[in-house]
Amino acid sequence: PYGCDVIVRRNQRSLAFILTRYSDQLAILNQVSIGAHPSYNDRENFGRVSLSLERDELMADLRYQICALKGMTESFGAVLHHVKPHGALYNDMVHDQDLAEDFIKLVKQIDPNLKIFTLANSSVIELCKKHNVQGVNEGFADRRYDLTIARWDHLRV
């Protein structure tokens, strides 16, 4: 029931690669599901800023990130369990159905058994269903929700 998201970037320096590998191995030792956490290649802001890229370029970069971790995980005898978009990509997918659909298709091409973690009750969950990919509703402990999993941060208690 526990998950660990690992970020892989193009041209990672050796220390970052070692940390990624260590995180992967630690998750395996502790029987924690491993997930890829791909994002825009925005090192300066750690993927928290939307980048205006050609869709093919973005999908190629996301494919690299997911496949790099998938290959590393499989080299340790484990399997990649899920994919969770990171930062601005996560938010952009909730508001841009074309982006979400391209992302879902990409994940399905890589491995149709991968689950996609996304905002609870969002349009991304519906698109996952449309493409026969398991979408996992996600909530955040530091946000307030009502019983429908709708955010209500705007209310003060």
Tell what function each PLM region has.
Residues 44-85, 92:
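Glycine/small-residue-rich loop that forms an oxyanion/phosphate-binding "nest" at active or ligand-binding sites
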Residues 21-35, 74-77:
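Acidic (Asp/Glu)-rich catalytic clusters
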Residues 8-25, 53-68:
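Glycine-rich anion/phosphate-binding loops
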Residues 121-157:
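Active-site rim beta-loop-alpha module in soluble metabolic enzymes
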Residues 75-123:
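Hydrophobic, well-structured mid-protein blocks that either form specific transmembrane helices
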Residues 5-13, 39-45, 86-90, 119-121, ...:
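Active-site beta-loop-alpha junctions enriched in small/polar residues
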Residues 2-10, 44-59, 94-96, 110, ...:
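Glycine-rich tight-turn/loop motif centered on a GG-T
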Residues 2-4, 34-38, 81-85, 116-118, ...:
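Hydrophobic faces of well-ordered beta-strands that scaffold small-molecule active sites
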